[in-house]
Amino acid sequence: MQLQFLGTGAGQPSKARNVSSLVLKLLEEINEVWMFDCGEGTQHQILETTIKPRKISKIFITHLHGDHIFGLPGFLSSRSFQANEEQTDIEIYGPKGIKNFVMSSLRVSGSRLPYRIDFHEFDENSLGKILETDKFTVYADKLDHTIFCVGYRIMQKDLEGTLDADKLRAAGVPFGPLFGKVKNGQDIVLEGGTKIIAADYISAPRPGKTITILGDTRKTDSSVRLAVAADVLVHEATYGKGDEKMARKHGHSTNMQAAEVAKEAGVKQLLLNHVSARFLSKDISVMRQDASTVFENVHVVKDLEEVEI
């Protein structure tokens, strides 16, 4: 499971950072890739990666500001041009209005897609659990921005315990169908009458990962709720230390406020993105150092960077 950042800038693209988009790679878990926001130029950023557009099965939009959605029509159109590849349907989750934006753009441009788009829109009264599969659950909650904006909490369900094959062989169980039965939790009896209790050879279930991805926001209690005990928190840092008044005025956060959220939520790792073009490379180092005085395990991500979860 990995996060790859396609755009880490704020508001408008710069030479160093494109506007907002990232993907959660779940190839080993479910052979899918989930995208979060799709700012202008996202499809071009994908060309610099190994991501296959047809593998992107779900897109989660945090809010309807242009730097988070203007790349959608182009990406969806280009996704249909994957020659010799199977066309796969796609689901888009986001605030009410995202369907109208996408369909209007496709209609006006005369774009015809060979696959289906399923929209899942929500407003302030329909948040909470927005998706559940056999392996993942996704929650959304309202943040505090200048327009309706949400954050997402992606929870992987507990993983099955692993079979201790060496211990099982030592108990006299031959490799083959009996192994499969024990792996599936079924007790067996060997030819000599020895009873094998499956639970004795399977480790306890392993807790799944939790990833929190926030849209644009001021520091707010819902950010903490979404991030409680998360393995990774992706939080915006449009502004730096000392810019709290400016951040509040424009509906954003500073690096220090993001670190406070991470500390209060008890997350394992904080990844800062949505960085203003005002910050040069040397400023990024200071931004990280300042935030680390509040929450130690913090990193400011850059475009195309991939983080293992």
Swiss-Prot record:
Binding site for Zn(2+) 1: H63, H65, H145, D216
One Pfam entry name: Lactamase_B
UniProt keyword annotations, A-Z: Endonuclease, Hydrolase, Metal-binding, Nuclease, tRNA processing, Zinc
Cofactor: Zn(2+)
Amino acids binding Zn(2+) 2: D67, H68, D216, H274
InterPro entries (UniProt xref): Metallo-B-lactamas, RibonucZ/Hydroxyglut_hydro, RNase_Z/BN
Note describing how the cofactor binds: Binds 2 Zn(2+) ions.
Active-site residues annotated for this sequence: D67 (proton acceptor)
E.C. number(s) listed in UniProt: 3.1.26.11
A molecular function GO annotation: 3'-tRNA processing endoribonuclease activity
PANTHER family: ZINC PHOSPHODIESTERASE ELAC PROTEIN 1 (PTHR46018:SF2)
Free-text function comment from the UniProt entry: Zinc phosphodiesterase, which displays some tRNA 3'-processing endonuclease activity. Probably involved in tRNA maturation, by removing a 3'-trailer from precursor tRNA.
Family as reported in the entry's similarity comment: Belongs to the RNase Z family.
Full protein name: Ribonuclease Z
